Curated annotation (Swiss-Prot):
This is Zinc finger CCCH domain-containing protein 3. It comes from Arabidopsis thaliana. It is an enzyme of class 3 (hydrolase). GO terms for cellular component: nucleus. Its EC number is 3.1.-.-. Disulfide bonds: none annotated. Residues 350-374 have a biased composition (Polar residues).
Amino acid sequence: MRTPMSDTQHVQSSLVSIRSSDKIEDAFRKMKVNETGVEELNPYPDRPGERDCQFYLRTGLCGYGSSCRYNHPTHLPQDVAYYKEELPERIGQPDCEYFLKTGACKYGPTCKYHHPKDRNGAQPVMFNVIGLPMRLGEKPCPYYLRTGTCRFGVACKFHHPQPDNGHSTAYGMSSFPAADLRYASGLTMMSTYGTLPRPQVPQSYVPILVSPSQGFLPPQGWAPYMAASNSMYNVKNQPYYSGSSASMAMAVALNRGLSESSDQPECRFFMNTGTCKYGDDCKYSHPGVRISQPPPSLINPFVLPARPGQPACGNFRSYGFCKFGPNCKFDHPMLPYPGLTMATSLPTPFASPVTTHQRISPTPNRSDSKSLSNGKPDVKKESSETEKPDNGEVQDLSEDASSP
């Protein structure tokens, strides 16, 4: 005859055995065996009474490690197959569109969408020399074909061919031939320059085209940049471009086709910067292509860094120069400018500092300030300032005008 005490002891012993078996089973579950046969314990804490760590359930990792206060179950759900240094596969979840477009995911293992391995988009994407993706199965990017750049960058889903194979028709730009240019060390340089047609500019300004750098040729992937030098003219009223012929060629191409009418007021943006972002559609007047060359500098020019994957520098893309120089954190692609001739030999680094500025008109006085305010210099008056008399001596007309 069993006593009640013996029954309770039997029940307690059975419960203890069940608990011990559960603990043993949990211990086997926690223990992982790798390929070498050595056991590996779960590096994250197991807290049965706490909530499950959502970050661990999504990615299989936890940034807090052993200090996390949530539970980290040993067996992850079946729809999460995480591999170290790879993007997670989440079967049943929508496909990650960013991953299908670029082959990468900026969210990494924290992305909650599915990243299939057998998709074509998961393969490494080829990039052109500017840093834009080339997708042979997609149609060409219309914005890239017009402007030569793409504001979406690596996230664009369209095809971006190589610049020497593409055609850019923005602001009258056409396709650009390739030339064989080399460094002084013998390395082949990416050449996308052609011959520059003579721009139509007022007679008061003589454009002088020089090599992209007045001391050395920049390496491939770096854009030419000339350090700012002192100019004898006001920057606001007479903006000049850097010593880079690439920026000067860009200015000539951008200003090509701008309307010049005396009936309309002057375009303030054009007067301040020398270019107009509206192009032919601008309704204001653009008084000539104002390009002046700064005095030559004996300091070697700096170069702007090319940072593929970063947004393009707005100043460099619009005007051809960057005020931040080599410290700029944005991308400065070596864009192909049409009509640019680059010197194949290195110029002398120590040039003569005694040079004359390219402006041939004298300093304006009060009498001709009215003509200059309209943006059109009085060519007739400037040409009649000096004349040669019969005796060969130079006669100043200003003295004759003051005499009775």
